[in-house]
Amino acid sequence: VEIFNYCESNGYRYSRYADDIYISSSDYLPIDVKDTLYKLLQKYTFGINFSKTGFHSRKSRRKVTGVVLTSNGELSIGFSERQKIKKMLYTYLVHENGEPRKILGYLAYLKDIEPQTYNRFITKYSSYCNTDVIDALQEKCKQDN
């Protein structure tokens, strides 16, 4: 609460997810503010990973807890994660090699973050199995039980 209050009273935004803490501002944090924040974090036994500490503008790629915030403010799973899902789908549907449950999990993640991309993938990859790709994966999961 003390860190949150300090940030709020100085015009900064404090966000936390598990052990990841984010201090957001429209500009670089002044040295005295950084020093105060470091002291507060240490007071509450938070370690600081300086390799993950930095300034990210709207022009740079911002990845927070595995989700990319694009320059236009949209959420994305990122190019490499999309490629991974494509590869898993193709490998499973064409070569029958892969883990259907894992693929379904990745597709659920994609659907939450990028629903339009999810719909494109479902349409595209359903043509590989002549049915709905989700139905095909779920059916395989039932058979494996």
Language model segments and positions:
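Catalytic palm active-site di-aspartate
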Residues: I3, C7-S26
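Right-hand nucleic-acid polymerase module
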Residues: E2-N5, D27-N145
